[in-house]
Amino acid sequence: MYLFGASGHGKVIKEILNASGIEVQAFIDDDLNVTECAGCTVMHESAGLTPMLVSVGANKTRQKIVERLRNENPGIRFGIAVHPSAVVSPSAVIGEGTVVMAGAVINADAVIGKHCIINTGASVDHDCVVGDFCHVAPHAALCGQVHLDEGVLMGAGSCAIPCVKIGSWTVIGAGAAVVNDIEGGVTAVGIPARSK
């Protein structure tokens, strides 16, 4: 496996893969000054390298990198990383490029899109739909049947009550409680969460 993004987030993903018995061949990064990360060589060209995970935390940046990699290498494959301590229902679906970190829980019939981050201790309950390029940050909780459109960031410790929908590229602030649907493209904070 190759990791695009020689970062702190990348170090965590490397350790997840290693804990799952998967070797990281190298990191790839655009910063020519970075030559080593977490004991691995950092390369500066990605042509022909596969399978890959994009180890960048920012949702929009991750999306742009994935698009670039697909354009450069139409045959690229993207892996999945799931920490051994994560609890993932056998009926859950996890899309390519997604990372599920230590202590996360994904329950029955949840659908996680492509290139998502389900971070440390986060929970995604039954029948949730998490769109591509979303990030459910550490200890955030989605109750049953929550729907996140593409690119949503659920901030650390935030929560969403059952059946709410959050529009694409919205940011839910740390510790916020979503009790009603939230439109796309906004930042919502507080208890209850309201767009700023």
Would you name each region that the model predicts?
Residues K14-I16, K64-R68, I112, E183-G184:
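Short amphipathic alpha-helical segments
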Residues G8-K11, K60-T61, V93:
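Short alpha-helical
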Residues M1-E45, I76:
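Hydrophobic, well-ordered beta-alpha structural blocks that scaffold small-molecule cofactor pockets
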Residues L32-V87:
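Phosphate-bearing ligand-interacting subdomains
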Residues M1-Y2, V24-Q25, T50-L53, S168:
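Short active-site oxyanion
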Residues N71-D125:
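Hydrophobic, well-structured mid-protein blocks that either form specific transmembrane helices
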Residues M1, T120, D132, A137-K196:
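Glycine-rich hexapeptide-repeat left-handed beta-helix
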Residues M52-S55, V100, V189:
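Redox-cofactor binding/interface segments in oxidoreductases and associated redox assembly factors
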